[in-house]
């Protein structure tokens, strides 16, 4: 028995499903999850000692590569001074200043420990600020696992209160409306009918939880115009895209100024750190200034802040995003080329350090189109690449990530492996 399988079987005895986050269980692709023993740069080594070129990168945070010496040293230095205090630190002020400097839309920011905390509190804050209850999200966009946001969409103009998880009462989600991503007409009709009742609209400005779907310019412009017109709060959930697609995040690429922004992943440099921030008048409603409550024992943890500050310093080096973007684009375009040579139908896309590939004849623009891709072919390709020592996300609905540690040679070796894998399909 392999060490990976042994650990998986042991884990299932004491951890539900053997993992601490569902996608890690290889449920969609089948087989045995790889238990990571260590990671460095663009690689990780599993419990059996096999090396993999990693395009998951901890689901996005590892933008400078695993175990970057400057990030590791920052965490080590912070640990010597204590692990947690339950009191404010200078580092919290410094990283807040850095976030506000990088994102003009963020006038004030609050640190939390997870993306779920960030989006959950941003929703609560928007409701407290507007005095309204209704929230709008989009089908296929994931915003963490708080009850109000675990809602799936159905047919028709709106879907009221359809929880997509057990244990979520319908009463918790009856104020959540689900619309179609990139559907400007539906969005406009919704605001025309009930715009004065909507507290906020939350979206992934580049959807990374239905593979990779970019919004149309018309869609993001309509979002900003309609929310402003009706007094609703526009929330850009940049937990995944924040500092991953550009130094100014997705909002900078779109030329949109949201009212609130949520951050995570990259901002913590691989440690548990997230944030929400935005307009000062909205942020002024949060406790202790206002009546909207939020708190956390480990919020602003000094080790997480140290890792985040070190990472934010590294990504601001000249040419960082130009190099990252060009290598990611080469990977995406190269995958399409290798598939074409093998006679395999494949579409690809990339933005900044994120990429997606889909076994369909065109890149999807909505959840319905994303779920129409050939999942069986994806499974075979995933395992073929795993055999080649290349680790892609074990789900057809997750974006991939390139780091600064991925060299041109690594990208080319990945494409050569993909050519062999496509030939096996």
Curated annotation (Swiss-Prot):
Listed EC numbers: 5.4.3.8
Location within or outside the cell: Cytoplasm
Pathway(s) this gene product operates in, as recorded in its UniProt entry: Porphyrin-containing compound metabolism; protoporphyrin-IX biosynthesis; 5-aminolevulinate from L-glutamyl-tRNA(Glu): step 2/2
Modified residues (N6-(pyridoxal phosphate)lysine): 265
Major place of residence: cytoplasm
Catalytic reaction list: (S)-4-amino-5-oxopentanoate = 5-aminolevulinate
Alphabetic keyword roster: Cytoplasm, Isomerase, Porphyrin biosynthesis, Pyridoxal phosphate
SUPFAM superfamilies, sorted: PLP-dependent transferases (SSF53383)
Pfam families in alphabetical order: Aminotran_3
Keyword Isomerase: yes
One of the record's GO cellular component terms: cytoplasm
Gene label: hemL
PANTHER family: GLUTAMATE-1-SEMIALDEHYDE 2,1-AMINOMUTASE, GLUTAMATE-1-SEMIALDEHYDE 2,1-AMINOMUTASE 1, CHLOROPLASTIC-RELATED
Residue ranges the record marks as coiled coil: none
Named cofactor requirement(s): pyridoxal 5'-phosphate
UniProt key word Isomerase: yes
A GO molecular-function descriptor: glutamate-1-semialdehyde 2,1-aminomutase activity
The protein, known as: Glutamate-1-semialdehyde 2,1-aminomutase
Subunit structure: Homodimer.
InterPro entries hit by this protein: 4pyrrol_synth_GluAld_NH2Trfase, Aminotrans_3, Aminotrans_3_PPA_site, PyrdxlP-dep_Trfase, PyrdxlP-dep_Trfase_major, PyrdxlP-dep_Trfase_small
């Amino acid at each position: 028995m392999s060490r990976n399988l042994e650990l998986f079987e042991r884990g299932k005895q004491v951890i539900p499903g053997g993992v601490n986050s569902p996608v890690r269980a290889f449920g969609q692709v089948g087989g045995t999850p790889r238990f990571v023993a260590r990671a460095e740069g663009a690689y990780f080594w599993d419990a059996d000692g096999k090396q993999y070129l990693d395009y998951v990168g901890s689901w996005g945070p590892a933008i400078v590569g695993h175990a970057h010496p400057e990030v590791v040293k920052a965490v080590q230095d912070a640990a010597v001074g204590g692990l947690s205090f339950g009191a404010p630190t200078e580092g919290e002020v410094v990283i807040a200043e850095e976030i506000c400097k990088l994102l003009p839309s963020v006038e004030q920011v609050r640190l939390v420990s997870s993306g779920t905390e960030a989006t959950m509190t941003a929703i609560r804050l928007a409701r407290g600020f507007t005095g309204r209850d209704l929230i709008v999200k989009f089908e296929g966009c994931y915003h963490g696992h708080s009850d109000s946001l675990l809602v799936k969409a159905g047919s028709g103009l709106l879907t009221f209160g359809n929880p997509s998880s057990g244990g979520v009462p319908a009463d918790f989600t009856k104020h959540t409306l689900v619309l179609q991503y990139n559907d400007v007409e539906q969005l406009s009709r919704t605001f025309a009918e009930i715009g004065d009742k909507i507290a906020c609209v939350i979206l992934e400005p580049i959807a990374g939880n239905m593979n990779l779907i970019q919004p149309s310019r018309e869609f993001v412009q309509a979002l900003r115009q309609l929310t402003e017109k009706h007094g609703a709060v526009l929330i850009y959930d940049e937990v995944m895209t924040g500092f991953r697609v550009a130094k100014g995040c997705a909002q900078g690429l779109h030329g949109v100024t949201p009212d609130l922004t949520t951050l995570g992943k990259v901002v913590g440099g691989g440690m548990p750190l997230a944030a929400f921030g935005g307009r000062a008048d909205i942020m002024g409603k949060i406790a202790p200034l206002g009546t909207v409550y939020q708190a956390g024992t480990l919020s602003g943890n000094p080790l997480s802040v140290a890792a985040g500050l070190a990472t934010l310093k590294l990504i601001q080096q000249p040419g960082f995003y130009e190099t990252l973007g060009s290598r990611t684009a080469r990977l995406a375009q190269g995958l399409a080329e290798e598939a074409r040579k093998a006679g395999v139908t494949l579409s690809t896309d990339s933005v900044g350090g994120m990429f997606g590939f889909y076994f369909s004849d065109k890149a999807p623009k909505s959840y319905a189109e994303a779920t129409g891709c050939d999942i069986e072919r994806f499974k075979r390709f995933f395992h073929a690449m795993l055999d080649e020592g290349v680790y892609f996300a074990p789900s057809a609905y997750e974006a991939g990530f390139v780091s600064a540690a991925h060299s041109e040679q690594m990208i080319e070796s990945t494409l050569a492996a993909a050519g062999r894998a496509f030939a096996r399909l």
